[in-house]
Design a protein with these regions (language model features):
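Phosphate/NTP-binding elements of NTP-utilizing enzymes
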Residues: 1-158
Length: 158
């Protein structure tokens, strides 16, 4: 098996398996659209659920340190940061790449709009950029990006 990706569908977690790199590349290609056409819905609120939990509580996991539940939580998060996550909505499906998931949930950045440190917001342009780079990587290509200023891409490409 080439990849096993955590998958969220209708409130349940499971896995989507890809037998080959080519199968995964074909799957990513089906998800790739023009910016503005990704159709984020309420499921997109889950993309940065861990960052929102941290903002609300001041910590990520409320389980006792080194307990089985604590270790399971962090193992699940490490897996999502290594493999990415697939989310199914009512009409659309999204693959959050491993680096985009980590960036949204675990890398506070300076928000120039709010003038304070916080987590990145889910933005169509950054999702598109992450998917574009994943497609380039899987096809062993380089990626050139023409983008507007002030969308935190310097943080994303560290």
């Amino acid at each position: 098996m080439y990849k096993k990706i955590p998958t969220y569908k209708k409130g349940e977690w499971s896995y989507t398996e890809f037998e080959t790199q080519e199968e995964f590349a074909r799957y990513l290609t089906t998800l790739f659209k023009e910016p503005g056409q990704y159709g984020f819905d309420e499921v997109a609120l889950l993309f940065n659920e861990e960052a929102n939990r941290f903002n609300k509580n001041g910590f990520y996991c409320d389980k006792p340190f080194r307990s089985k539940d604590y270790i399971k939580y962090w193992n699940d998060q490490k897996e999502k940061c290594r493999e990415g996550v697939i989310y199914y909505g009512e009409k659309n499906t999204w693959y959050i790449t491993r680096d985009y998931y980590m960036w949204l949930n675990f890398l506070p950045i300076f928000d120039k709009e709010e003038k304070k440190y916080g987590f990145a917001k889910v933005r169509d342009a950054q999702y598109h950029m992450a998917l574009y780079e994943a497609l380039a990587e899987i096809h062993h290509k380089h990626a050139a990006i023409l983008k507007k200023r002030q969308i935190a891409s310097s943080y994303f490409h560290m």
